[in-house]
Amino acid sequence: MNFKDKNCFPNELIALAKISKNDVLDKFGTDVFKKVVYDVLTGKNVREFTEILTRTRLLESNLSFFDFFVDKMKEGITPKQLYLYAKNALSNKSYVKSNQPVLEWMVMMTNKQTQNVLRDEHGDGFDRLALRTQEEILKIKNGYEDKIGEISIGGQKVSLEDFCYIILSLGSQTLTIRGSEKSLHGKYFEKLILGSLFTIMGFEYKEKIEEGLNAKCFTLSTRADDRESDATLVFNGKAIRVDIGFIGRGNTEISLDKVSRFRRMDDIGGVMHNISTMVIVDVIGDRSRIVNMAEEIDGKVVAMSDPYWVAKVSSYISSKLNVDDLLEDKPQLKDIQSFISDALENVDLEKYIKL
């Protein structure tokens, strides 16, 4: 096979190997994202949405890859032969860049594994790994051959040995896509949720805080002297550094450990500000120390699993920046939900997705 040919793999297989947030936005539109943002701001889990996106992409990509194997078997090229062809192409660098992800899957690798296991070198270590893989497939498949026997796919007889090459390749493809999806959705959802949250609370987004700015404003993903925060709210010479993490029970202390290093005073827009800290996490475990840890640094931690979490954020911002608490007169959950729903109509979601 000629892996220097951009058309040697199905177009959809190459396209699904890497997608962008713009691809997701174009596919679903802002109305879908508005519903998701509303759900998150009212206590639902964002992963209910992103997991479906991931599984859809996985199914489309896995089936396209599987179909590729079937087509090649019809041409008389076995999965094991494809494995060896891909190995040689990677070793000799005889491929175009766009084909690299699929070639790595064909040798049961991901880009991250290529970095970590092979140290980005397709040399002797790669040869040893390929030989050992072939030996292990032959050894392990013997224990299942009598039970499974010969497999028929698309009218093609497939030995269990060849089927092992297919499923290992699909496994690597799955690892790549799950890692890609986690990174993709995590990055833009942080900005989308925080941007929407602070906009409905009356703060204006600024790419950078300028000197002399007196309005209620916020920035996203700021970094100063290696102390990074996901957002910074500023007003009246005071500021709140915000860290958000879509991480589960047991890992939330990681977020607080990071933000606890922020200074109590910091220069923002050429002016020294009193700094407070707020951590937004997905859920707080029953035995988590994070609430007490936050209090020790005069900070606040809220969990997005709490239907009232937006009201708690509003109250904390009001107390620290001396601004109106827009939800103070809305103790009922239905009133909070109604406020959020109405306010989201005026939020430019596309702006925050594309940041």
Curated annotation (Swiss-Prot):
Cited Pfam families: RE_CfrBI (PF09516)
KO phenotype (gene knockout): Loss of restriction enzyme activity.
Top EC class for this record: hydrolase
EC number of the protein: 3.1.21.4
GO MF annotations, alphabetized: type II site-specific deoxyribonuclease activity
Keyword Nuclease belongs to the record: yes
Keyword terms, alphabetized: Endonuclease, Hydrolase, Nuclease, Plasmid, Restriction system
Superkingdom, taxonomy of origin: Bacteria
InterPro entries tied to this protein: Restrct_endonuc_II_CfrBI
GO biological-process terms attached to the record: DNA restriction-modification system
Protein name: Type II restriction enzyme CfrBI
Organism: Citrobacter freundii
